[in-house]
Amino acid sequence: YAHFGQLYDPVDSEQFLYYKEIKDGQILEEGINEAGAVSSFIAAGTSYSNHGINMIPFYIYYSMFGFQRVWDFIWAAGDMRARGFLLGGTAGRTTLNGEGLQHQDGHSHLAAAATPNIKAYDLAYSYEIAIIVHHGMKEMIEEQKDVVYYLTVENENYVHPPMPEDAEDGIIKGMYKIRSTDQPTLRLLGSGPLMTEVLKAADLLHQDWEIDAGIWCVTSFSELRREAEEAERWNLLHPDKKQRKSHLERKLKNYRVPTVAVSDYVKMVSEQIAPYVPGPYYALGTDGFGRSETRENLRHFFEVDRYYIVLAGIRALALAGKIKKTKMQEAVKKYKIDPEKPSPITV
């Protein structure tokens, strides 16, 4: 590194986006310097006010080293009315396999949910990222809103399907339907990288148990909660007016269908919306410290893989009186689930 300019030819110099060090560049590589990096984010994010120049910074980092390390700075950024995007890379407790408890983030969305100016999204597919970034830039530049978007993105390779029709509004509001069925007896909510496990669990429910599940992709539990809370507040203060319903309540209006929600974060993330979901609601999450393991073993350890989702769905239906309770024990045996395995939060 040389502060007056790059003195060598990088190995990727033939590529369009090759590594380069220049004084007037647009990419700052701050290294392991969280305080300096977030300060650069704040400087760029307040440029619209301090210098009259709209700059929309994208601060990209290991998601564990964002709110966990610099939440005080992020809070200060909100106080200074900064604008921009925080991108937590390698996010989720089970997607970053092999790096142990220091790196596996399962709780940054709790911190984001508690920060008033943060709009937090846990994204599963590339089209969701495109929609959210476009909407965020529209809010910050065109509508001049003082908001910061927090996006968690993962490092796991899987097939990205085409965007369903009319999904854009739901992606922004926090939830959209990804698979329909004529008469669902169960509702599955998935988030981020665990959408793949939810889809596979739905296939097992259909093939092994003749249970049809409607599937929803949740892009933001916190945005769903905030809108539902605002609707409830308005209804509280306007009892003489027509009562409002949130996006969540409009879409999930069948009281007879139990819901199982799954995310790669602690249960409290998906439990945010429990008071506003009609019918029984059960959350699966990754409570506990991370571990150095494969994705498959991590998801089984934290009880969020397809087999635990199936078991949770069967239990939800059994408790609702829709199927026999003996089906639960059948599922435990069929999928070789150890009833005596340690609880993940105690290990």
Residue ranges, per PLM feature:
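Thiamine diphosphate
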Residues: Y1-P161, A167-I171, C217, S222, ...
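Peripheral docking tails and interdomain loops at the edges
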Residues: D12-Y18, K119, S126-Y127, N254-V347
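Hydrophobic, well-ordered secondary-structure elements that form the walls
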Residues: F41, A112, Y125, L188, ...
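Generic long, charged, amphipathic alpha-helical segments
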Residues: F41, G174-D182, L186-R187, A202, ...
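Hydrophobic alpha-helical bundle architecture
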Residues: S47, Q243-R256
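Short hydrophobic beta-strand segments
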Residues: P57-F58, T152, P184-S191, V260-A261
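Short conserved micro-motifs at the rims of enzyme active sites and ligand-binding pockets
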Residues: N97-G100, P162-P164, E227, E271-A274, ...
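Long hydrophobic segments that form regular secondary structure
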Residues: K138, D146, E168-G214
